[in-house]
Structure formats: structure tokens, C-alpha cells
Amino acid sequence: MVNLTAAEKTQVTNLWGKVNVKELGGEALSRLLVVYPWTRRFFEHFGDLSTAEAVLHNAKVLAHGEKVLTSFGEGLKHLDNLKGTFADLSELHCDKLHVDPENFRLLGNVLVIVLARHFGKEFTPDVQAAYEKVVAGVANALAHKYH
């Protein structure tokens, strides 16, 4: 659960309504893999990830980034039950994929940067504060199975 005020919920959903999940999802996952190169080990089956340029243009990375942000957007519809919403993904990432749960926090941080880059002045400090709460809540929900 994320404790957001009514105003924060409105800010989050209003901005999210403008998000192009294909574009921003690809950028967010690509940035994660470039900035934190050790995360690439989870995506070795995606092909060439040897350079930043290769990552940024890898069709499988871009498609998976879209999938990630689509799931994130679904989570925004269930802010009062993030653990339930992400229970299956938490189990998958823990039991099958063995993803370090810290990576969820890192991806959340990258997503905030991508949103700020794309929305500029519209991504005010108040909007950022609301999104920081949301990405922390989603990361916590995804890490739930690990506890």
C-alpha cells in the first residue's frame, strides 16, 4: 500500500495518462541496463548487450521495457493493494528468475529520471515526491516474496 493524498493520486494518474509506455518503458529499461551493467545478466538471452549503443537499440529490451511499464501502469490502478497486484510477478522474479530485489528500487529510480526528462516543468517537485512514493511501493511489493 502506498499512502498518497488525494492530490498526489490525482497528480500520479494525470501524468501517467500522458505516458507513452512503449517509448518510456524502453528508455527506462535501457537506462537501467546501461547505468547498472550488472543487471544485464538477467537479460543475456536478449542478444547483444555489450555496449550502451547495443542496449539502447535492442528490440527485445525495448519490448520488455514496454511490458514492464504496462505492468507498472496496472499497479497504479491498485495503489491500495500493490502487494496483491504484483504477487505473481514477485513470485516469478524471486523463485524462477532470482532477481536481486534491489534492482526493483534501481528501476524505480531510473523511471523517475525518465519521467522528469520527458515531462520537464510538468514534473514538479510535488509530482516527483508522489512518484517517489509510488515507485518505492511498487519495489516493495515486487520484493514481497523475498521476505
Swiss-Prot record:
CDD domains: Hb-beta-like (cd08925). Keywords: Heme, Iron, Metal-binding, Oxygen transport, Transport. Heme b binds at H64, H93. One of its GO terms (biological process) is hydrogen peroxide catabolic process. The keyword Protein transport does not apply. It holds the Pfam family Globin. The keyword Transmembrane does not apply. It comes from the Eukaryota. Red blood cells. One of its GO terms (molecular function) is metal ion binding. Residues 3-147 form the Globin domain. One of its GO terms (cellular component) is haptoglobin-hemoglobin complex. PROSITE patterns: GLOBIN. Heterotetramer of two delta chains and two alpha chains. Belongs to the globin family. This is Hemoglobin subunit delta. It comes from Loxodonta africana.
